[in-house]
């Protein structure tokens, strides 16, 4: 960790660090927590997209965003989560433990965002033909981060996240910017 911490190019409060996925067995299971502890107090927005202990161990360090899916959220609390109201209930429990914002993906059932300022957003999944769900969750995180940096608005970040994740699921590979923008245009047209 000493090497990782000394090599990070994080400079200021506008930086975002995304900690995502599993870690090799040879690494300590506290790796994400150790990184967050090392960066504590620098005002960096840290996003964590991981499962089980990798996710729950970081909550004390108040990550800017965590992104479990509904099944992972249920595993954390030992329950089965089947609807968006349950997602909101348990997302708030993660906030009580330290998460600032909780974005929960629900595959074809959409997504939910519970924000640090008390807003709750629910979305159905955009319509499209599923081609490849690999990377859709990572794409959702990338879209959310991009949308938040661009707008400093949770609703816009949520829309970008949902549309980016969905566009990737509707693509053979990861979505392109035009594919994401086309879904956002559809979303905005449908809501007007």
Write out the residue ranges for each language-model feature.
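Single conserved hydrophobic/aromatic residue that forms the stacking wall/gate
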Residues: 1-5, 9-12
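Conserved functional loop/turn residues at catalytic and ligand-binding sites
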Residues: 2, 62, 98
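Phosphate-coordinating loops and pocket residues in cytosolic domains that bind phosphorylated ligands
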Residues: 5, 60, 78, 159, ...
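A short small-residue
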Residues: 13-16, 143-145
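Conserved beta-alpha-beta core of the PfkB/ribokinase-like small-molecule kinase fold
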Residues: 16-85
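Conserved phosphate-binding/catalytic region of the ribokinase-like
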Residues: 37-38, 56, 84-192
């Amino acid at each position: 960790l000493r090497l990782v911490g000394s090599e990070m190019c994080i400079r200021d409060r506008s930086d975002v660090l995304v900690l995502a996925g599993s870690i090799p067995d040879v690494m300590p299971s506290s790796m994400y927590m150790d990184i967050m502890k090392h960066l504590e107090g620098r005002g960096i927005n840290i996003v964590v997209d991981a499962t089980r202990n990798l996710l729950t161990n970081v909550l004390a360090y108040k990550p800017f965003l965590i992104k479990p899916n509904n099944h992972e959220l249920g595993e954390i609390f030992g329950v089965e989560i089947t609807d968006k109201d349950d997602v909101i209930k348990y997302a708030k429990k993660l906030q009580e433990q330290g998460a600032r914002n909780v974005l929960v993906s629900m595959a074809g059932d959409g997504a939910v965002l519970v924000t640090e300022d008390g807003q709750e957003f629910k979305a159905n999944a955009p319509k499209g033909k599923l081609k490849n769900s690999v990377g859709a969750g990572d794409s959702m995180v990338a879209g959310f981060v991009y949308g938040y940096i661009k707008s400093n608005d949770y609703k816009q970040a949520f829309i970008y996240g949902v549309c980016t994740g969905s566009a990737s699921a509707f693509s053979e590979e990861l979505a392109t910017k035009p594919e994401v923008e086309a879904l956002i245009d559809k979303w905005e047209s449908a809501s007007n």
